[in-house]
């Protein structure tokens, strides 16, 4: 099992850099940046420029976005950003993509897309990225992203930086089955839960684990439908913590409860929010919060038995 952390791209930069150095010192296997722009009341850096800088603050962790929404970038531009960070980091880049949220269209001047069009775009973007991240030329005549790229820099990571797709519904799961190296979901909580005032659908840990298990069964079916061996597709979760579930960095027992709830699923990676999601939109963690986080991470991440590897798996051949 790998443990990673998701951080928001809120400055000042010096605090982010210090935090990422701490993540690595505490033994986290990866660190992710949430990728968005112009969120109301939320002064965020551009994620890939930020990752290029944070790559120089770290030496070991796999780094990337969780997720880069298909609503913000053309896939050729995103591929160039990923490969650039792969070189700057010495071969540690990964990229997560997903459908994102409808309001993101307006932030970059795009018309609103239907849910179906958004997921069709996700599938098309994933196919383009799957080729370009290998450094392959491409001539693609798709409906949304007609693309001709004659040359791409070869990545340091071979055969390519890992491509993660976050998906919950049938079309997204099929896109993951076709193109992804790793699938991700929101820890069994309702999609789009986020900082949502309506929390009536939030699930307990056993309920959330059961939902992840159901999604994994549907993912296996999607793999079968496209002729892919499901064992070649990694599985991961983002541990979204609703109010009815104690944050895993409240105590060692809370950490063990969350990890234990998903242990039977043989996940490849669990990603935790830090700071917690509710702090991303208000004041940062207090020194006491940070000290508790570091203490629990030291007990359960830094001091764990040596595992099979320290980074998110590179692509497996289907």
Sequence positions of predicted segments:
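Active-site-adjacent structural elements that line small-molecule/cofactor binding pockets in enzymes
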Residues: 1-318
């Amino acid at each position: 099992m790998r443990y990673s952390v998701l951080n928001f791209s809120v400055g000042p930069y010096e605090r982010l850099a210090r935090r990422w150095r701490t993540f690595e010192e505490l033994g986290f296997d990866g660190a992710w940046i949430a990728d968005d722009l112009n969120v109301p009341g939320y002064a965020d850096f551009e994620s890939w420029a930020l990752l290029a800088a944070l790559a120089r603050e770290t030496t070991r962790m796999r780094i990337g976005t969780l997720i880069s929404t298909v609503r913000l970038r053309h896939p050729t531009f995103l591929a160039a950003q990923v490969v650039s960070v792969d070189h700057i980091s010495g071969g540690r880049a990964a990229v997560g993509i997903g459908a994102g949220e409808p309001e993101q269209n307006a932030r970059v001047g795009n018309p609103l897309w239907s849910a179906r069009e958004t997921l069709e775009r996700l599938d098309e973007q994933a196919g383009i990225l799957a080729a370009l991240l290998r450094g392959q030329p491409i001539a693609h005549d798709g409906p949304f992203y007609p693309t001709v790229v004659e040359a791409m820099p070869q990545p340091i990571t071979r055969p390519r930086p890992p491509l993660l797709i976050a998906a919950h519904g049938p079309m997204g799961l099929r896109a993951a089955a076709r193109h992804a190296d790793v699938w991700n979901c929101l820890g069994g909580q309702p999609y789009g839960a986020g900082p949502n005032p309506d929390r009536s659908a939030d699930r307990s840990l056993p309920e959330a684990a059961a939902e992840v298990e159901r999604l994994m069964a549907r993912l296996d079916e999607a793999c079968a439908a496209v002729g892919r061996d499901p064992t070649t597709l990694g599985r991961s979760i983002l541990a979204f913590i609703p109010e009815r579930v104690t944050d895993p960095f409240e105590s060692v027992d809370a950490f063990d409860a969350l990890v234990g709830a998903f242990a039977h699923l043989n996940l490849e990676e669990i990603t935790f929010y830090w700071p917690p999601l509710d702090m991303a939109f208000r004041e940062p963690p207090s020194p006491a919060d940070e000290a508790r986080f570091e203490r629990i991470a030291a007990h359960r991440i830094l001091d764990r038995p040596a595992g099979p590897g320290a980074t998110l798996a590179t692509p497996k051949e289907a």
